[in-house]
């Protein structure tokens, strides 16, 4: 970036010129790392800490950031401001040290709000679909030559990054409701994909509180802003009269302003028509499977249409859409002869979905695109509280696959809850008489326990939000083949 470009960008947030050094606690998270990446590209000195290296920290180090793989008071020395992830507790030694040194400590969303303050902000919120919809909006705006800045919670595969600094006036960002911090944002346009009971500890277990928080988020829009909302979602339909802003609805529903019609899935692609008010019907080929992704695309098209983006640019972006990391992410198709001696192949797909609605959407997309495949799922429940609160929903959804292997619950810092563990969930599913789930007590045993259930015409879904993504990549690297002790030691 040349000096003139940097000066222009730094002038966007003039008061932040006083800030030189920004330190992130929990910098390895996708949302944190994305903001750090944008700020690094704006010329700020970036440092951060996390417990282990990952692709996010490597990308930031490539940009010149200093990363500590520990949490120590001296890490915040000389920082102008400390940005914290919602996963970081208040007694973290870096946060304590920052308070003692009178260094401002702010949440991730507060920093995102500052980036958005002097740009045309587009924020994407909702229980499910935020990451993919953010990537679709970003792809359309980039295809239209608008050079947006984007900050996403997942890897935008076409760009190879979670975030990118553009020179245009638009900032497109995923808005996180998990800790209610999206209330810091003041966008010009807000998408809400759906609203379900999740992260209920933030909302004192009160769903009405969660719904009101979404309304408060939408009230951050100026009176001339716009809310784009999925009318198929019953909670959104209920809340529409309370929004108090200009709205555009989308969905399969007949009364949607942007309506999805004639949906058909062929392999990994969706084909459908979008009907828009005062516009010609748009026949879409979307390079992403599932009806849920057609809805995500409809939201992106609604925003782009309102902005006056040319239909041809929209269609090009959707047809060439490369998706996001760990969202129905195709990792390869492998011959089974070396795995278990059988002929044929197995496809391997990695997916982040960890709520029953998300898991259900992934299963439906797999069934629609590959109806003749033996559907095998390796599932890792995420958080004991979520497993407890949505126990019956998980049991119902997971019976839809042909074979289920289940890892232990990924705790994400939570203490175990009796009856909300993987063994109990397997027992409940088995009792329903449709499938006989297999508990995998040790991640190192995954390949060994997976091999016998593969038939030679399989689609393997590796599903969950914990460390299961690493397991998926490991399975791809070894091409599903169980490793001998010598091979495992060599790896």
Swiss-Prot record:
InterPro entries: Mur-like_cat_sf (IPR036565), Mur_ligase_C (IPR004101), Mur_ligase_C_dom_sf (IPR036615), Mur_ligase_cen (IPR013221), Mur_ligase_N (IPR000713), MurCDEF_pg_biosynth (IPR050061), UDP-N-AcMur_Ala_ligase_MurC (IPR005758). ATP binds at residues 126-132. Keywords: ATP-binding, Cell cycle, Cell division, Cell shape, Cell wall biogenesis/degradation, Cytoplasm, Ligase, Nucleotide-binding, Peptidoglycan synthesis. It comes from the Bacteria. The keyword Cell wall biogenesis/degradation applies. Pfam families: Mur_ligase (PF01225), Mur_ligase_C (PF02875), Mur_ligase_M (PF08245). Disulfide bonds: none annotated. It is an enzyme of class 6 (ligase). It is found in: Cytoplasm. Gene3D superfamilies: Mur ligase, C-terminal domain, Mur-like, catalytic domain, NAD(P)-binding Rossmann-like Domain. Pathway: Cell wall biogenesis; peptidoglycan biosynthesis. One of its GO terms (biological process) is cell division. It catalyses: UDP-N-acetyl-alpha-D-muramate + L-alanine + ATP = UDP-N-acetyl-alpha-D-muramoyl-L-alanine + ADP + phosphate + H(+). One of its GO terms (molecular function) is ATP binding. One of its GO terms (cellular component) is cytoplasm. Its EC number is 6.3.2.8. Cell wall formation. NCBIfam families: murC. Belongs to the MurCDEF family. This is UDP-N-acetylmuramate--L-alanine ligase. It comes from Escherichia coli O17:K52:H18 (strain UMN026 / ExPEC).
């Amino acid at each position: 970036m040349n000096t003139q470009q940097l000066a222009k960008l730094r002038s966007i947030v003039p008061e932040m010129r006083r800030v030189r050094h920004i330190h992130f606690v929990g910098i390895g998270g996708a949302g944190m790392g994305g903001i750090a990446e944008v700020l690094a590209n704006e010329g700020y000195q970036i440092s951060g800490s996390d417990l282990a290296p990952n692709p996010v920290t490597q990308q930031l180090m490539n940009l010149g950031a200093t990363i500590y793989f520990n949490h120590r008071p001296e890490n915040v020395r000389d920082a102008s401001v400390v940005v914290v992830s919602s996963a970081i507790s208040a007694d973290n030694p870096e946060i304590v040290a920052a308070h003692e040194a009178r260094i401002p400590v702010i949440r991730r969303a507060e920093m995102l709000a500052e980036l958005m303050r002097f740009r045309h902000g587009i924020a994407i919120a909702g229980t499910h679909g935020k990451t993919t919809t953010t990537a679709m909006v970003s792809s359309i705006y980039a295809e239209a030559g608008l050079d947006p800045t984007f900050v996403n919670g997942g890897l935008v595969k076409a760009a190879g990054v979670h975030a990118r600094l553009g020179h245009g006036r638009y900032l497109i960002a995923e808005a996180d409701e998990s800790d209610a911090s999206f209330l810091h944002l003041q966008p010009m346009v807000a998408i809400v994909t759906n609203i379900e009971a999740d992260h209920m500890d933030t909302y004192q277990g009160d769903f009405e509180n969660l719904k009101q928080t979404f309304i408060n988020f939408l009230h951050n829009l100026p009176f001339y802003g716009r809310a784009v909302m999925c009318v198929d979602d019953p909670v959104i339909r209920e809340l529409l009269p309370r929004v108090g802003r200009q709205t555009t609805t989308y969905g399969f529903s007949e009364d949607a302003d942007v309506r999805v019609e004639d949906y058909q899935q062929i392999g990994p692609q969706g084909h459908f028509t979008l009907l828009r008010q005062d516009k010609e019907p748009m026949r879409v080929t979307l390079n992403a499977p599932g009806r849920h992704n057609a809805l995500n695309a409809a939201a992106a098209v609604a925003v782009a249409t309102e902005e006056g983006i040319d239909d041809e640019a929209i269609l090009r972006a959707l047809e060439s859409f490369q998706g996001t990391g760990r969202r129905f992410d195709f990792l390869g198709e492998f011959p089974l002869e070396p795995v278990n001696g059988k002929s044929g192949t197995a496809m391997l797909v990695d997916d982040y979905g960890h709520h029953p609605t998300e898991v259900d959407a992934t299963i439906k997309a797999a069934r629609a695109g590959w109806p003749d495949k033996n559907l095998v799922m390796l599932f890792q429940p995420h958080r004991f509280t979520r497993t407890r609160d949505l126990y019956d929903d998980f049991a119902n959804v997971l019976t839809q696959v042909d074979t289920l292997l289940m890892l232990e619950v990924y705790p994400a810092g939570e203490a175990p809850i009796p009856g909300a563990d993987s063994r109990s969930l397997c027992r409940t599913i088995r009792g329903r008489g449709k499938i006989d789930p297999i508990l995998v007590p040790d991640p190192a045993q995954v390949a060994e326990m997976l091999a016998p259930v593969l038939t030679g015409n399989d689609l393997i879904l590796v599903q969950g939000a914990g460390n299961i993504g690493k397991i998926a990549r490991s399975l791809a690297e070894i091409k599903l083949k169980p490793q001998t002790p010598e091979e495992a030691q060599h790896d």
